Design a protein with these regions (language model features):
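A short, surface-exposed helix-loop junction/capping segment
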Residues: 20-26
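Gly/charged, well-structured mid-domain segments that form the phosphate/adenylate-handling core
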Residues: 60-64
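Residue-level "edge-of-site" marker
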Residues: 57-58, 171
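Active-site core segments that coordinate phosphate-bearing ligands/cofactors
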Residues: 1-20, 31-42, 46-47, 68-184
Length: 184
């Protein structure tokens, strides 16, 4: 029995079961990882009776983890060289490399992440502190604010309740009122 998140399973399958790894960003989202020490949290593992042996090795977000097994991947041996949580990857991909830089991604959900640099910053307003990435043994942290169903809620208004006929109609309705009376 082994444990891992989606990227751990994908790497395991693509390498033909040879590599069981994750990166720091994914490990930090398992609720089993201590973001201060950068290790699996033994107190939590003991509390939940989880054997450390089933957890993946935690690696930098960009390094060669292994190679695809030609027997399971189109006859090709290709290096697998980077994994990250999707929103942390978007933070990196949108060049939010310096502390204080922010990105927002809209889709099914809405996700705003801010690079907070090399030390975890605790939010007093309900944001999640997480590992953004680790490169060359240097860890970068972020704060994450998420509305998990923002886009899905618009779809529900259109398809479920039939209050609107198109997503763009939400803007027209929002602009049609004098003020929001504090509702956002």
């Amino acid at each position: 029995l082994l444990f891992g998140t989606v990227e751990t399973w994908l790497i395991w399958k693509l390498t033909g079961g040879k590599v069981h790894v994750t990166d720091y960003s994914n490990a930090s989202r398992t609720m089993l990882f201590n973001i201060n020490t950068g290790e699996w949290d033994q107190d939590l593992l003991d509390l939940m009776e989880i054997d450390r042996k089933i957890l993946p090795e935690i690696c930098d977000s960009a390094q060669v983890y292994g190679y695809t097994d030609p027997d399971v991947f189109m006859g090709l041996q290709i290096p697998i060289a980077s994994v990250m949580v999707d929103q942390q990857a978007a933070l990196f991909g949108q060049a939010c490399i310096e502390p204080g830089t922010v990105k927002t991604t809209y889709g099914t959900g809405c996700f705003m992440l801010m690079n907070t640099g090399e030390k975890p910053t605790r939010s007093e307003n309900g944001l999640l502190t997480s590992v953004a990435w680790q490169l060359d043994k240097k860890r970068t942290y972020c704060m994450d604010g998420a509305i998990y169903i923002s886009g899905a809620a618009v779809q529900w208004l259109r398809d479920g309740l039939k209050i609107i006929s198109s997503a763009s109609e939400t803007e027209q309705r929002a602009l049609s009122v004098e003020n929001t009376n504090g509702v956002y």
